[in-house]
Amino acid sequence: MFWINMALGLVVMYVVMFSMIDGLVDFKNNLNMFYMAVTMWAPMGIFMLATMPGMYPNRRLNLALYALFVLLTAGSFWATRAQALIDDRQFVESMIPHHSGAILMCREADLSDPELVALCGEIVEAQRREIDQMNRIAERLR
């Protein structure tokens, strides 16, 4: 049951990473979102083992799992920061949802400061233009 919980948790965390995109058209599977999901997921394994010891009585296995989850947390954090395995294609697949998030925030935020409202207008225009450009690049890279 532990691994079913963990597998479902990883899937949910990966999908939730995309809750900030402006629309489904900007959904792009990418390694950066996976790295971030693992960075959130692996500590959950530690918390589950630590807070429910009665459910996981095998001490030796638990110690091995603690070590695994610590390594996965550190490794995924490093992979995100180092942009490990992020090539041209992965770069645009990562940046499109990122830019889309800026559009969503500008559109949905309850802004009243005139300078911020104007800035958001510029952000939306620039980010959409850059998303279009990255989509063209992604097509070329396929």
Show where each model-derived region lies:
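Alpha-helical membrane segments of multi-pass proteins
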Residues: M1-R142
